[in-house]
C-alpha cells in the first residue's frame, strides 16, 4: 500500500487539519466552468453501475440515496461533463451500516471500474484516497480523523490539479498527494457494503477534459 508521505506528515503534525503553510490548490484557468447537480431531480446522464440508488425526501428536500445493503460497493457515475483539473464537493449523510457506513466522491472516472475516489466512513477513524483500476481498489493516501457522525450531514471536497490532489472533510484539508493514474474523466458517488447513505449538493468547478 503506497501512502503519500505528505499526507502522513499532515496527519501526525497537525492532527485533524493541515498546516497553515500548505498551499491550497485552486482552479484558476480561464477555461474553467461550473456544474451544479441537483441530486433530488432525475437526470438521464446518471449511470447507476451498482447498488440501488433512489431519490427520496429527507429533511424537507429531495436527495439521492443509496439503499442497497448487499453490494461490495455501490457506484454511480454522472456521464455528463468530463473534467481534467477540478474542485468538486458533495454533501453526504451516513444513515446506517454495521459493516460500513461510508460516503465517497468519485472523480476522473473512465467508467464504473476505473476512477479515483475520496471517501469517509462513520465506522472508521480514517479519511482515504483510492485508485480503482479494473475494479481493484488500492489505498494511496490516508489520514486519521474523528468518525463522521451517523445521521448528520458532512461534506467531502477534492481539488485535483495536474497530478496533485488535495482532499477535505468538513472543510479540513487532510490529504495532499500526487497521483498520475488518471488525468481526466467524470465525477460520481460511492458507498460500500451495507452503507445506506444520502447525497446532496454536488458541485464541480473545473476545466473540461481535452
Regions found by a protein language model. Give the residues of each.
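Extracellular glycan-recognition surfaces and repeat-rich motifs
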Residues: 38-72
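Predominantly extracellular/luminal carbohydrate-interaction, adhesion, and secreted-enzyme modules
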Residues: 105, 181-197
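Beta-strand-rich interaction surfaces with strong enrichment in secreted/lumenal proteins
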Residues: 74-81, 142-148, 177, 189
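Extracellular carbohydrate-recognition regions
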Residues: 20-50, 200, 210
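Short, solvent-exposed beta-strand-to-loop segments that form ligand-recognition rims
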Residues: 168-188
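Short, aromatic/His-centered strand-loop micro-motif at the edge of beta-sheets
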Residues: 134-155
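Short tryptophan-centered beta-strand motifs in secreted/extracellular beta-sheet-rich domains
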Residues: 88-90, 151-167
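Secretory/extracellular carbohydrate-interaction modules
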Residues: 68-133
Amino acid at each position: 500500500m503506497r501512502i503519500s508521505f505528505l499526507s502522513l506528515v499532515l496527519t501526525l503534525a497537525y492532527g485533524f487539519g493541515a498546516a497553515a503553510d500548505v498551499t491550497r490548490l485552486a482552479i484558476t484557468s480561464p477555461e474553467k466552468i461550473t456544474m451544479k447537480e441537483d441530486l433530488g431531480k432525475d437526470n438521464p446522464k446518471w449511470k447507476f453501475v451498482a447498488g440501488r440508488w433512489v431519490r427520496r425526501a429527507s429533511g424537507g428536500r429531495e436527495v439521492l440515496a443509496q439503499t442497497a445493503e448487499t453490494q461490495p460497493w455501490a457506484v454511480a457515475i454522472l456521464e455528463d461533463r468530463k473534467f481534467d483539473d477540478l474542485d468538486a464537493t458533495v454533501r453526504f449523510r451516513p444513515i446506517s451500516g454495521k459493516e460500513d457506513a461510508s460516503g465517497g466522491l468519485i472523480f476522473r472516472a473512465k467508467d464504473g471500474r476505473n476512477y479515483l475516489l475520496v471517501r469517509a466512513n462513520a465506522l472508521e477513524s480514517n479519511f482515504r484516497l483510492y485508485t480503482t483500476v479494473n475494479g481493484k481498489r488500492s489505498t494511496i493516501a490516508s489520514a486519521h480523523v474523528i468518525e463522521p457522525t451517523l445521521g448528520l450531514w458532512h461534506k467531502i471536497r477534492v481539488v485535483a490539479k495536474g497530478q496533485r490532489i488535495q482532499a477535505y472533510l468538513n472543510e479540513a484539508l487532510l490529504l495532499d498527494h500526487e497521483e498520475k493514474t488518471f488525468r481526466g474523466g467524470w465525477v460520481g458517488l460511492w458507498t460500500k457494503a451495507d452503507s445506506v447513505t444520502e447525497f446532496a449538493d454536488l458541485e464541480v468547478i473545473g476545466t473540461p477534459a481535452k
